[in-house]
Amino acid sequence: MRTLEVSVVTPGGPVLEESFEMVVCKAETGEIGILPGHIPLVSPLQISAVRLKKGNDTKYLAISGGFMEVQPEKVTILAQSAETASDINVQRAKEAKDRAERRLQAKKDNIDKTRAELALKRAINRLDVGK
């Protein structure tokens, strides 16, 4: 079966460079599946899991937004952060989730609600991928 070269890069450097048969990401317009030969496109990505399929194996990455560039035989994901399931510290993600929930429940005026909501989404995404 044909494959795509997939590169996932963060400001800290490359996270993954490998070949896969299919890439599934959550773009701003909804979930998108990429197969070899896909038309070129650039799309912003949401905080979500990226599914990378090769044969019967599926690898998951937790990404915190970014962009995806698609060429017929290559997918490049430029993300603010990206972690493989094995790299996620589940305990730390649970603590981040609890902290964000407490901030959102607090009735203080000085809370940046948008920032707390994004932190909660990132923590939930990391927990989902890390399990």
From Swiss-Prot:
For this UniProt record, the keywords arranged alphabetically read as follows: ATP synthesis, Cell membrane, CF(1), Hydrogen ion transport, Ion transport, Membrane, Transport
Summary of the function given for this chain in its UniProt record: Produces ATP from ADP in the presence of a proton gradient across the membrane.
The UniProt entry, under SUPFAM superfamilies, shows: Epsilon subunit of F1F0-ATP synthase C-terminal domain, Epsilon subunit of F1F0-ATP synthase N-terminal domain
Q: How does it assemble?
A: F-type ATPases have 2 components, CF(1) - the catalytic core - and CF(0) - the membrane proton channel. CF(1) has five subunits: alpha(3), beta(3), gamma(1), delta(1), epsilon(1). CF(0) has three main subunits: a, b and c.
Endpoints of the signal sequence: none
Tell me where in or outside the cell this protein is found: Cell membrane
Any matching Pfam family: ATP-synt_DE_N
| CDD domains listed in its UniProt record | F1-ATPase_delta
The protein here is known as: ATP synthase epsilon chain
Q: Which domain of life is it from?
A: Bacteria
Q: What family is it from?
A: Belongs to the ATPase epsilon chain family.
User: Which InterPro entries does the record cross-reference, listed alphabetically?
Assistant: ATP_F1_dsu/esu_C_sf, ATP_synth_F1_dsu/esu, ATP_synth_F1_dsu/esu_N, ATP_synth_F1_esu_C, ATPsynth_dsu/esu_N
Q: Which organism is it from?
A: Oceanobacillus iheyensis (strain DSM 14371 / CIP 107618 / JCM 11309 / KCTC 3954 / HTE831)
Its placement in the membrane is given as: Peripheral membrane protein
> Would the keyword Ubl conjugation turn up in this protein's UniProt record?
no
Q: Which GO terms describe its cellular component?
A: plasma membrane; proton-transporting ATP synthase complex
Gene Ontology molecular function: any one = ATP binding
Q: What is its main location?
A: membrane
